[in-house]
Amino acid sequence: MTKIFEARVLKVGPEAAGMIKDANMLILFGEEAPEDLAEYCYKIDNKKLSGTITKGGRLLIDNQEFPITAVGAVVEKNLKNLGHITISFDGSNEGSLPGTLHVQAAKPAVLGIGSVIQLFS
């Protein structure tokens, strides 16, 4: 597999961990996250995507591996332009929302400042 994206978490909003616990999802946003969303986001340092995100690819968060099960229609565009995607740990095979990346997870990710997020296709 080829690495197509890597970012580090710069800041964790006060409600971000609660989104994982309560909604089984996390929100990534580049440094320009709108203030009203920032409290729910993991701010990341990179928006450079060098390939296509595909079903069957892999998401790695601090070496925790999650198979990609569905890719929303605007995931790549939002990641490139805003550093923004929602990652849902529900294993859905059909994208529920255009900006959501779905992954299979026995348990949701645990991440914090300095965590490394990678995508492979």
Please give the residue ranges for each predicted region.
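Short, solvent-exposed secondary-structure boundary/capping segments
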Residues: 75-86
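Helix-rich interaction surfaces within compact, conserved domain-sized segments
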Residues: 17, 28, 91-121
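Short, well-ordered loop/turn sites that connect or cap secondary structure elements
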Residues: 51-54, 59-60, 111
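Short, structured beta-strand/loop micro-motifs enriched in basic residues and often containing a Trp
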Residues: 37-48, 93-103
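N-terminal disorder-to-order initiation segments that are Gly/Lys/Arg-biased
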Residues: 1-40, 115-116, 121
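Short, conserved beta-turn/loop elements at beta-strand boundaries and strand-helix junctions
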Residues: 64-65, 71-77
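Conserved "cap/hinge" positions at secondary-structure junctions
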Residues: 62-63, 121
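Short, conserved secondary-structure segments in the cores of folded domains
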Residues: 49, 55, 75, 105-107
